[in-house]
Amino acid sequence: MKNLLHKIASAFVVCAALVAFTACNDDDGKVKKPQVSSELVGSYTPHYFKEVPDEWGGEPSRLYLEVAAAWTDPDNIPGIDLSESMGMPAGSFVMPFNTILDLVSAIGSQFVSSGLVQLDLHSDGLFAAKYHDVVVEEGADIMTTIFSPTFAEAVSVFPSAETAAVLPEGALSFYTESNLFFAAVSKDFIRAIEKQEGMEILSEIDKMLGAYKGLSVVSTDSHYAIPFKYTFEGGVLRLYVDRAMMLLYVKLLKDVLGGLGLDPSQMMGLDPAVILDDLFNATTELQIAVYLKKM
């Protein structure tokens, strides 16, 4: 069972982490480029949705990634017990979820505003991007990289010769349907990864979709796609997922985490499954949204 979950985790990460988009293919393997009829076709730059005043009178902070929640009991918001990580007795230092979500919004906003330069959604369903790579200093720990990221001055481009070896053009695409934005990945691209890595990915994804009924993943002969909700008003695209959409994946995520055999002693006393349950039980609404301004 653990090996199966490892395979499922690998397959799921490939699809979810690519966060993206697919093209349809001819029987001879050549990429078709059907036209996408969508109001979203165009070029975008990061857009902030909120300014937070600086308590010392400096420039306000701008937030580009929204993480918002409505709480079951606003006066008693639970949190995560970080006492063990601080070398303190259990229950001494509990960070409430609302503070944690604000922190996630602030950290994510750095990556959106400083990392992404431009996103292009093309009429053939493909996309392009200009961005700054995250610079990982030698010897830097992961927490430093996350909380205080450094970005390269040079602007990188996708697709390019440098990115083609990892993500060939046509592997990722998008389409809109029924007021949803679908991010999809080509099955031919996944087959290429299977051949290169000697892994069974497609079959494990299909097993996962069969085992976890109700997941919102769309599977066709050519691609897998994951839907996102969106609004488009005044030239601003708000791309988001809500609590109901996330809830579909909670059981899968908990099972995958359980199958990884994580050592509790290395998790600072934290149980990801319990944290997920506590968060969703404490909320009536939860949204994660990114804002983009059409150029």
Where does each model-flagged region fall?
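Short, exposed beta-strand-loop hairpins at the edges of beta-sheets
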Residues: I275-T283
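A solvent-exposed, charged loop/short amphipathic helix patch at secondary-structure junctions
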Residues: R62-D102, V256-L276
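Flexible low-complexity loop/turn motifs enriched in small/helix-breaking residues
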Residues: W56, G115-L116, M268, L286-I288
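General N-terminal leader/first-domain-start detector
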Residues: N25-D27, P53-S61, S83-P89
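Bacterial N-terminal signal peptides that target proteins for export
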Residues: M1-F12
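Bacterial Sec-dependent N-terminal signal peptides
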Residues: K2-N3, A17-H47, A282-T284, I288-M295
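Tryptophan-anchored aromatic micro-motifs
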Residues: V36-N76, K130, L292
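Contiguous, well-ordered beta-strand patches that form the walls/edges
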Residues: S83-L252, V256
